[in-house]
Amino acid sequence: TLKPNESAVINVAYCALRLDEQFNLNFKNEQACREDFIKKLDDTLIIKTPNEHINLMARYAKIRGCESIFKTKSGLMHSPGGGNYYAALWTNDQCEYINPLFGYLGYEIGEQESINCYEMYRKYIYDDRAVITSIVAEGDDIWHGAKDRGDSAMYAYGLARFLLTYGDKQLAKN
């Protein structure tokens, strides 16, 4: 029982492992890594408006966007979260919205994820029909929702913005 003015720290870890993997968790080390991660993000793309609430929301959105990248069997994948869509890519969430931001941030993991995302979608680009809506199950399956050109437009728009902000001419030529 805590007495007035006392505090306690409770550490929680959400983890997933394959049966043959081992996991050693050092909460002090994890806390130090997280603080370093956030410090680095705080030094990039700082939004300053007259409204401190908007500034703080932009900071939190940047952190959340950068911490939502997972190593999968198909490479790095950004997930929109919510607990339902891990190891899946969407033309709106990843291709159009978050990936172009990574070109501005200089966040290497985000840049690698973006390149992987666009490459994974490349094999689903057709001349006669729309690009798929989502790549799911670590890249093993797809979901082709709307089946209209909206997903194709989101992919193309996001890719163009990412390539312009990332600034790699050779990658753009590919």
Locate predicted features.
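Short Pro-Gly-centered flexible turn/kink motifs
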Residues: 2-18
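Terminal connector regions
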Residues: 16-55
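Substrate-binding groove/exosite segments of carbohydrate-active enzymes
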Residues: 39-173
